[in-house]
UniProtKB/Swiss-Prot annotation:
Coiled-coil portions: none
GO biological process: translation
Protein name as annotated: Small ribosomal subunit protein uS2
Gene3D superfamilies linked: Glucose-6-phosphate isomerase like protein, domain 1 (3.40.50.10490), Helix hairpin bin (1.10.287.610)
Entry keyword set: Ribonucleoprotein, Ribosomal protein
Highest taxon listed in the record's lineage: Bacteria
Disulfide bonding pattern of the chain: none
A GO cellular component entry from the record: cytosolic small ribosomal subunit
Parts of the chain that traverse the membrane: none
Length: 260
């Protein structure tokens, strides 16, 4: 049985690609047709690719590996954080800071600062320091949590990367490839699939599409950790795909054009 159904994909708008004038020819094999200037992704291939990505991440998790979830575009930020936390994994959902993977020794010093500030507050140091200094320290803490909070417990390199939109996350992908870390990615019709080891051809602009697919990847990790079946994970998550309407394709894609 497939990890995800065609009905789920359709209701989440996963099949809507980018405008035909904004495409990468390497994605041709994942395109079903064109409609009103928008490429329609072949969901039969998406179902198959989701299965492949799911099984890979499940195996990574079974082997005790960790996955770094990356999605810094507005449509992905909430899902990336929520699903990574649900699965007990690492995440980056704000700006990717150069060296998170390739220069982690330096980045880890900044991560360590988070705990240092927390200990300062616990020990009552904020009560004796000048108020202005405390305000600045708290601002520093908020910045660190915003950009590095999702990797504060990452003591070693992740065994896999999951990204939403390879174009947006090209710096993260470049670092992962340099370190030979396998990459799973939601890849829209304007992206280069060659950069991704496990391609999930899908709409990377609709919030519901991103949420659905990111949730499935988190399920894979949980199944690997706990040895539970797909059905048990789905029942526990109790996803109701009918609670929101699919975002208008034209509006979503035009917003993406402006942001890029």
């Amino acid at each position: 049985m497939a990890v995800i159904s065609m009905k789920q994909l359709l209701e989440a708008g996963v099949h809507f690609g980018h405008q035909t004038r904004r495409w990468n020819p390497k994605m041709k094999k994942y395109i079903f047709t064109e409609r009103n200037g928008i490429y329609i992704i072949d969901l039969q291939k998406t179902v198959k690719k989701v299965d492949e990505a799911y099984n890979f991440l499940k195996q990574v998790s079974e082997d005790g590996g960790k996955v770094l979830f990356v999605g810094t575009k507005k449509q992905a930020q909430e899902s990336i954080k929520n699903e990574a936390e649900r699965a007990g994994q690492f995440y980056v959902n704000q700006r990717w800071l150069g060296g998170i993977l390739t220069n982690y020794k330096t980045i880890s010093k900044r991560v360590k600062r988070i705990s240092e500030i927390e200990k300062m507050e616990e020990d009552g140091l904020f009560e004796v320091l000048p108020k202005k200094e405390v305000v600045e320290i708290k601002k520093e803490y908020d910045r660190l949590i915003k950009f590095l909070g999702g990797i504060r417990d990452m003591k070693s390199m992740p065994q896999a990367l999951f990204v939403v939109d390879p174009r947006k996350e090209r710096n993260a992908i470049a670092e992962a490839r340099k370190l030979h870390i396998p990459i799973v990615g939601i890849v829209d019709t304007n992206c280069d699939p060659d950069e991704i080891d496990y391609v999930i051809p899908a709409n990377d602009d609709a919030i519901r599409a991103v949420k659905l697919l990111t949730g499935k990847m988190a399920d894979a990790v949980l199944e690997g950790q706990q040895g539970v079946s797909n059905e048990e994970v789905a029942a526990e998550q109790n996803i109701d795909l009918n609670e929101d309407e699919v975002v208008e394709v034209e509006e979503v894609k035009e917003t993406s054009v402006e942001s890029n």
